[in-house]
Amino acid sequence: MKNAEIAAMFEKIADVLELRDENRFRINSYRKVARVIGDLTDNIEDMARQDRLKDIPGVGEGHAERIGEFLRTGHMHKYDEVMAAISAFFMY
């Protein structure tokens, strides 16, 4: 199941946003979704196939798009973006 992998990605995004001192509500949103997805008993891939991602508490249009992108492509642009930014930060 991809649940744990996606939950970890959302948690890491929240960590980086927090390091960058970004909007607290946005950080909390990512943390909540990470926690909820990590606790899901349903397979998130099945939920995506059934167009039920937005049934997950805290998952709106943006988070659903990110999850769907990862399930389709194996990559999440937002995750890649924040990880690249934090890597660049620690290089200097």
Regions found by a protein language model. Name each.
Residues M1-Y92:
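Long, highly charged, low-complexity intrinsically disordered interaction regions
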